[in-house]
Amino acid sequence: MGQKIHPHGLRLGITSDWKSHWYADKSYADYVAEDIKIREFLSKGLDRAGIADVVIERTRDRVRVDIHTARPGIVIGRRGAEADRIRRELEKLTGKQVALNILEVKNVDANAKLVAQSIAEQLTNRVAFRRAMRKAIQSAMRQPQVKGIKVVCSGRLGGAEMSRTERYHEGRVPLHTLRAEIDYGTYEAHTTFGRIGVKVWIYKGDVVGGRRESEINAPAERRGRGDRNARPRRGGQRRQRAEQKQEG
């Protein structure tokens, strides 16, 4: 089951949070359709901005949209002109006041959606699919929080007449473990031979007691050789005592 189902939907409320934060009684279906239109508008209009995630929060008379992007300068524009244009378009779409927040994604190589988009852009530029996949895997595995990655490309790879699926993975990607923090992203590459689908799974450790594995291991990693609070080794104490006895 973990191999087929969407990793984000399977872990809602466990390791992942909802992408839309609002409550509605009678207008629930209208809000869902509106959220889909907002995300489609942003993904099509800002395809070069590297949008990783869009979080929507609603109140009675206001809509807040958080855009997580790898290139915030493209979304903001010169002197905020592009951000103002996006806000006006969203206000026309929703009929309410829109608060737009633009957040930068600092670690691009550890975000599944951005990794999938990077591979798709390389395939569009006629880069060999194996080279693009391996390069993305190597870049992701260099990140300290990434424990494993799996990449799948499907379509007319290399311009072949018959479509096929190629898979590459490195490290652990436990899709059946509910406490595992799995980041999942997809993207489509539009080539002269047709569309090629790219899927990426990134495993970032387990979530124990509401805390991520990277947050738990961070204090232990900080305590290194140069840390003054680190406990001295027993061997060093014995050596000091032996030297003091010899001097005495």
UniProtKB/Swiss-Prot annotation:
Protein task: Binds the lower part of the 30S subunit head. Binds mRNA in the 70S ribosome, positioning it for translation.
SMART domains xref list: KH
Protein name, per record: Small ribosomal subunit protein uS3
InterPro entries, A to Z: KH_dom, KH_dom-like_a/b, KH_dom_type_2, KH_sf_prok-type, Ribosomal_S3_C_sf, Ribosomal_uS3_bac-typ, Ribosomal_uS3_C, Ribosomal_uS3_CS
Coiled-coil boundaries: none
Signal peptide stretch: none
GO molecular function: mRNA binding; rRNA binding; structural constituent of ribosome
KH type-2 domain ranges (all copies): 38-106
Keyword vocabulary terms for this entry: Ribonucleoprotein, Ribosomal protein, RNA-binding, rRNA-binding
A GO CC term assigned to this protein in UniProt: cytosolic small ribosomal subunit
